[in-house]
């Protein structure tokens, strides 16, 4: 007994092609095996729906079915997935049903999205970071061709790619039935753009870009630290009329004897032991700056004395960190007779005194 394909799709015999396609898409959403994992009944129903659509969506097959009530499927060995010619419709259903580009992802899709941004690592000194600076940076990039405005076309006229018909992708199908694996690759003709130049640009030869050497000045903000990224818009590579950005990634190099922690700076400073005991005042230099630091009496080795607000400027412009001075005490290796005499006197006096340092 011949199958009633119209009843299977739920349409009348005078249904238009749009009505038939709409009915198929709705039923395919409902019964597709990937939406009903492990459901054999849904799997058979989906196969039946696909068979009905294969016949009714083809004018010649539909005419034969309407006139005789039979098709090659009825007379032969039955419907086979190798006979199905509408896998694009099923892929469209995946995209609508699951959202976005699910079909491409599910079937092993690939979309060419070139990374147009350029990242350059630039070394600067801690002094440059302290005061701010301007650095010259040289690099090479693929810039937009000004002759064709990045279109790749001599007359800026683009036509639909004849290979991918504007999709920018080519599909390679492997396997059978709804277990087919569809691999989506970049179109080899238009390189994913979907369009090609009507006549290639005489300057860039159809690529839309030209290689360009850049020599730019980059402003280093006060307080910059390692791994800070400075973004320069539209100074990256170009592709398809779109230009990426240039990111300058800073590496701040500390000079010997100076350490940075956040916005605080640590330096070592050596004093003699009489000053450590009696106290005094020392001049502390940092780059082009000079500070007077009071040394309290009884200062110990390794003690940290703080100069408020003399550290790295905060990059947001609100204040600065601190300059932390790590005290080292120098013990002389060679003494004069008088110095030895005074120290012996000091030691003896200390033994007699109740006060101990």
UniProtKB/Swiss-Prot annotation:
Residues 4-69 form the J domain. The keyword Repeat applies. Its cofactor is Zn(2+). Zn(2+) 2 binds at residues 161, 164, 187, 190. A zinc finger (CR-type) spans 132-213. Signal peptide: none annotated. NCBIfam families: DnaJ_bact, PRK10767.1, PRK14290.1. Homodimer. Its main location: cytoplasm. This is Chaperone protein DnaJ. The keyword Metal-binding applies. The J domain is necessary and sufficient to stimulate DnaK ATPase activity. Zinc center 1 plays an important role in the autonomous, DnaK-independent chaperone activity of DnaJ. Zinc center 2 is essential for interaction with DnaK and for DnaJ activity. The gene is dnaJ. Belongs to the DnaJ family. GO terms for molecular function: ATP binding; heat shock protein binding; unfolded protein binding; zinc ion binding. GO terms for biological process: chaperone cofactor-dependent protein refolding; DNA replication; protein refolding; response to heat. Zn(2+) 1 binds at residues 145, 148, 201, 204. It is found in: Cytoplasm. One of its GO terms (cellular component) is cytoplasm. CXXCXGXG motif repeats lie at residues 145-152, 161-168, 187-194, 201-208. InterPro entries: DnaJ, DnaJ_C, DnaJ_domain, DnaJ_domain_CS, HSP40/DnaJ_pept-bd, HSP_DnaJ_Cys-rich_dom, HSP_DnaJ_Cys-rich_dom_sf, J_dom_sf. Binds 2 Zn(2+) ions per monomer. Keywords: Chaperone, Cytoplasm, DNA replication, Metal-binding, Repeat, Stress response, Zinc, Zinc-finger. Participates actively in the response to hyperosmotic and heat shock by preventing the aggregation of stress-denatured proteins and by disaggregating proteins, also in an autonomous, DnaK-independent fashion. Unfolded proteins bind initially to DnaJ; upon interaction with the DnaJ-bound protein, DnaK hydrolyzes its bound ATP, resulting in the formation of a stable complex. GrpE releases ADP from DnaK; ATP binding to DnaK triggers the release of the substrate protein, thus completing the reaction cycle. PROSITE patterns: DNAJ_1, DNAJ_2, ZF_CR.
């Amino acid at each position: 007994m011949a199958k009633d394909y119209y009843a299977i799709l739920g349409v009348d015999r005078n249904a238009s092609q749009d009505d038939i396609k709409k009915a198929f898409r709705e039923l395919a959403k409902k019964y597709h095996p990937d939406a009903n994992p492990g459901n054999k009944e849904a799997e058979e129903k989906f196969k039946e729906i696909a068979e009905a659509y294969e016949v009714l969506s083809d004018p010649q097959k539909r005419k034969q079915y309407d006139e005789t009530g039979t098709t090659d499927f009825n007379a032969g060995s039955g419907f086979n997935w190798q006979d199905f010619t509408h896998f694009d419709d099923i892929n469209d259903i995946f995209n609508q049903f699951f959202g976005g580009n699910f079909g491409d992802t599910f079937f092993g899709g690939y979309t060419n999205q070139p990374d147009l941004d350029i990242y350059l690592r630039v070394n600067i000194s801690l002094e440059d970071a302290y005061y701010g600076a301007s650095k010259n940076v040289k690099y090479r990039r693929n810039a937009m061709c000004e002759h064709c405005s990045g279109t790749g076309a001599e007359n800026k006229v683009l036509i639909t790619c004849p290979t991918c018909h504007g999709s920018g992708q080519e599909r390679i199908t492997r396997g059978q039935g709804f277990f087919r694996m569809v691999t989506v690759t970049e179109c080899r003709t238009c390189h994913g753009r979907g369009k090609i130049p009507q006549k290639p640009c005489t300057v860039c030869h159809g690529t839309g870009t030209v290689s360009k050497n850049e020599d730019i000045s980059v402003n280093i903000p006060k307080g910059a630290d390692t791994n800070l990224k400075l973004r320069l818009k539209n100074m990256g590579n170009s592709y398809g009329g779109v230009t990426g950005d240039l990111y300058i990634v800073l590496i701040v190099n500390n000079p010997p004897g100076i350490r940075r922690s956040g916005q605080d700076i640590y330096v070592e400073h050596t004093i003699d032991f009489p000053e450590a005991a009696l106290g005094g005042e020392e001049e502390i230099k940092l780059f082009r700056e000079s500070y007077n630091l009071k040394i309290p009496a009884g200062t110990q080795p390794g003690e940290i004395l703080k100069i408020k607000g003399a550290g790295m400027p905060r990059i947001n412009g609100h204040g600065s960190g601190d300059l932390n001075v790590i005290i080292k005490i120098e013990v002389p290796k060679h003494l004069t007779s008088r110095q030895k005499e005074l120290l012996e006197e000091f030691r003896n006096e200390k033994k007699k005194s109740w006060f101990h340092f």
